[in-house]
A protein has these predicted regions:
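Conserved N-terminal entry element of GNAT/NAT acetyltransferase domains
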Residues: 1-33, 37, 41, 50, ...
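Charged catalytic carboxylate motif
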Residues: 34, 126, 153
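Acetyl-CoA-dependent GNAT
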Residues: 26-30, 37-110, 115, 128-129, ...
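Conserved GNAT acetyl-CoA-binding A-motif
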Residues: 135-146
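Conserved beta-strand-loop-alpha-helix junction that forms the acyl-donor binding cleft
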Residues: 119, 145-155, 172-177
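Conserved acetyl-CoA-binding loop-helix of GNAT-fold acetyltransferases
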Residues: 114, 120-133, 156-160
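Conserved functional loop/turn residues at catalytic and ligand-binding sites
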Residues: 31, 113, 117-118, 122, ...
């Protein structure tokens, strides 16, 4: 049985009636495929994995979708990971996955996705707040989230929710399949 997490107390004056009906609950193993599909629908333009494929093509015969799907499977398998679903009327409209490091007390928001038809309605905010609340209950002392430069939504949203930019990282790749390596 999925455990609902009440978030309505954060939305008492929500103008959007859908927001009053949103439920946040822990994902079950049976939710894996819908979470993967939400991810693939959302991450084409904002995924490091899709950047790799755009530049180098398939790697080991695997598409960016294959690699990103594996990341989501890892989120579900992680004993210190949690996946929270946002649902309305039993329809999954988004999710957030987190990883809890009990030694460092740092919780990481690994993936966040809202279905295209529900974006810009506050669902992402609710999911992040639910993730933060869960991290606090699990005695985390710091919440961390990362985004790519090309993710304009993340770059705008995360600071509004209290996250502070600390550093930028540049990803480089070299094609080792090329016989003409320098």
């Amino acid at each position: 049985m999925k455990q609902p997490i009440d978030v309505k107390q954060r939305l008492p004056n929500a103008e959007n009636s859908m927001m009053n009906d949103i439920q946040i609950q822990l994902a079950a193993k049976s939710d894996l495929e819908i979470v993967i599909q939400l991810t693939l629908d959302a991450f084409a333009q904002v995924s490091f994995e899709s950047n790799i494929e755009s530049e180098f093509g398939l790697v080991s015969g695997l598409s960016w979708q294959d690699r990103k799907s594996e990341h989501i499977r890892d989120d579900f398998k992680d004993p210190d990971g949690r996946v929270l679903l946002a649902t309305v009327a039993d329809r999954t409209i988004g999710f957030v996955s987190i990883r809890l490091n009990r030694k460092t007390k740092i919780g990481v928001i690994a993936n966040l996705t809202v279905s295209a038809d529900e974006r810009n309605g506050g669902v992402g905010r609710v999911l992040i707040q639910a993730a933060i609340d869960l991290m606090k209950r699990e005695s985390m002392e710091l919440a961390r989230i990362e985004t790519l430069e090309q993710n304009d939504v993340g770059k705008s949203l995360y600071p509004k929710l209290g996250f502070r930019e600390l550093a930028r990282q540049i990803y480089y790749c070299q094609d080792l399949r090329d016989e003409n390596l320098v």
